[in-house]
Amino acid sequence: MLNRVAASCALILINSPVYAFDFSFKGMIKSEVVTSSQGVASFGGAYSQVAPTHALRTDIFGGAPATEQQTNFLESESTSFQAAQSRFSLNMNHEKIRSVLEFDFIDGEDGFTNQTALQAQEPRLRRATLYYDMDENWTFFGGQKWSTAAGIKSSGSYNWIGNAYRAGKSGFLAVEVGATYKNDGLMVTGALTGKGRNATAGGINANELGRMPGLALDVNYSFSGHKIGAAGHFAELNFEDEAGFTAGENQDATLMKVYTTLNFGAVSINAEYYTGDALNNQNALGVAPSSGLNGAGEVRESFGESGFFTYLTWKVNTDSTIKVGYASASVDSSDRNRLSLTDLNENTTAYINYGHKLMDGLTGFVQFTHFNTEYGGDFEDFSTVVGRAGVVFKF
């Protein structure tokens, strides 16, 4: 009797419409130790090893000349344990519809400054995207996703969140609606982008796109395991309608890039070059400061910049991989005289890492990264070395 009941319930569940949806749960847990030879920052201006992006000035603390003790702090070595770059995603497929909902755990709200696990590791939405595959050629999408203008998504670094940003890597996540056309090796994507006003936000979100929509484009072609492409984002920052506006004019926010992936058996090379204006107003995470209104309500003109990154991957054997990367970005020479002592003028990073498969799903790694950062005003440069070692469990 019980067997018949169980069989009947199973038959009902199998034929229930809800089970026509195919769900999968994926994720990565990264546990590591991070050490730096002296002050390193994670996107902001505080000593932080959460997601290192550049070396800190050691002669300025909190925007003022550093005291001897503050300089000692900024020049001191530091070591921390980190798990904040872990992430997971829920994926769904149903006939022609696909979706992904992805979160990671990092101190994004407070500027990547909290490093204590119980204080910092809060869920942060990364991707929330819906795709409709109309046929084998056309896909329509909407939601928060990797920017159409992101180009190459990874810099080959185990610093997934830092990802060589502010040092030659550009293009992060964006809210978009658009379409992709694929035919043989050709892929063309176009999207409308935009962000609402957010006058109270800080950091990279301080001045969001005030006029919708922006336009993002990507065209790439794949052949014989290689890929070449070009991408861009074009928008306008509408400051003239802001509540505190007193003088100035709207600013262009542009990003243009070319990129390539070349595969030669066990060795592959990724490279990208970009140029643009007001990258940090586009969530493209450039080296220059964002545009915005100053305390008097005057528009701070956008800064032009350019940069590039490249990394080489060597698949030593089925279990071991070595990656070597180099990236550099700088503010345009015509705009450098407007930089302050705490603004970045040029930032360069070089890194090498080794990953080894310990068992199915589990990889051990070690990475060394060197940052050299030149600041505005007096154009002094500062350097630091960051080491990291740990394990990644993918499920």
Language model features with spans:
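Gram-negative bacterial Sec-dependent N-terminal signal peptides
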Residues: 1-20
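Outer membrane beta-barrel
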Residues: 21-45, 49-51, 55-197, 209-212, ...
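Sequence/structural signature of outer-membrane beta-barrel proteins
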Residues: 34-36, 106-113, 145-152, 156, ...
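Outer-membrane beta-barrel proteins
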Residues: 73-78, 116-118, 163-167, 205-207, ...
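Membrane-spanning beta-strands of outer-membrane beta-barrel proteins
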Residues: 81-83, 123, 172, 212-214, ...
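Detector for outer-membrane/organellar transmembrane beta-barrel domains
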Residues: 217, 221-348
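C-terminal closing repeat unit and adjoining cap/tail of repeat-based domains
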Residues: 353-369
